[in-house]
């Protein structure tokens, strides 16, 4: 019976040892393992969140860059249109100014022409009166008349 008493003693010691381990040793080990699992899970979740945030930030940056390029293209297009419009307006204004200057020149030439004609008429009238006086003062014969007309033509 010695084997039985030893076996029973070992069994009781083993049961006490298991109970002691389950009561005092096992809970801190399980707690440490669970904390480590939680830290690892939190780290993985944080990594996934960071990856998602990074992707989201990259998408936002891409969208903002696209919008900025679009706005820049619109600004450039508006500037080109505005520049073309200014050039066209200035060209039109230049043409109008040129037309005004040409018209003023034509008017000035026409006025000068009319003034010269009027002056010429006055001179012709004076010469005609002078010629008529000379004809009346002289005897009217054909030769004298021809001389006077030739002199008048020479004076003109």
Curated annotation (Swiss-Prot):
One cellular-component annotation, GO: plasma membrane
GO molecular function per UniProt: proton-transporting ATP synthase activity, rotational mechanism; proton-transporting ATPase activity, rotational mechanism
Keywords (A to Z) from UniProt: ATP synthesis, Cell inner membrane, Cell membrane, CF(0), Hydrogen ion transport, Ion transport, Membrane, Transmembrane, Transmembrane helix, Transport
UniProt topology in membrane: Single-pass membrane protein
Taxonomy, superkingdom: Bacteria
InterPro entries per UniProt: ATP_synth_B-like_membr_sf, ATP_synth_b/b'su_bac/chlpt, ATP_synth_F0_bsu_bac, ATP_synthase_B_chain
A Pfam family reported for this protein in Swiss-Prot or TrEMBL: ATP-synt_B
NCBIfam families cross-referenced by the UniProt entry: ATP_synt_b, PRK05759.1-2, PRK05759.1-4
Assembly information from the UniProt record: F-type ATPases have 2 components, F(1) - the catalytic core - and F(0) - the membrane proton channel. F(1) has five subunits: alpha(3), beta(3), gamma(1), delta(1), epsilon(1). F(0) has three main subunits: a(1), b(2) and c(10-14). The alpha and beta chains form an alternating ring which encloses part of the gamma chain. F(1) is attached to F(0) by a central stalk formed by the gamma and epsilon chains, while a peripheral stalk is formed by the delta and b chains.
Functional summary from the UniProt entry: F(1)F(0) ATP synthase produces ATP from ADP in the presence of a proton or sodium gradient. F-type ATPases consist of two structural domains, F(1) containing the extramembraneous catalytic core and F(0) containing the membrane proton channel, linked together by a central stalk and a peripheral stalk. During catalysis, ATP synthesis in the catalytic domain of F(1) is coupled via a rotary mechanism of the central stalk subunits to proton translocation.
Protein name: ATP synthase subunit b
């Amino acid at each position: 019976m010695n084997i039985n008493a030893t076996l029973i003693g070992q069994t009781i010691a083993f049961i006490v040892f298991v109970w002691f381990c389950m009561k005092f040793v096992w809970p801190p080990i399980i707690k440490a393992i669970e904390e480590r699992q939680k830290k690892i899970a939190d780290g993985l979740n944080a990594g996934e969140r960071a990856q998602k945030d990074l992707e989201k930030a990259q998408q936002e940056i891409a969208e903002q860059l696209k919008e900025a390029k679009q706005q820049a293209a619109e600004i450039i297009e508006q500037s080109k249109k505005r520049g073309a419009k200014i050039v066209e307006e200035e060209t039109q204004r230049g043409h109008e100014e040129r037309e005004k200057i040409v018209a003023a020149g034509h008017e000035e030439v026409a006025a000068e022409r009319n003034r010269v004609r009027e002056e010429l008429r006055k001179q012709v009238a004076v010469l005609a009166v002078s010629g008529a006086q000379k004809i009346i003062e002289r005897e009217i014969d054909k030769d004298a008349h021809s001389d006077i007309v030739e002199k008048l033509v020479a004076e003109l």
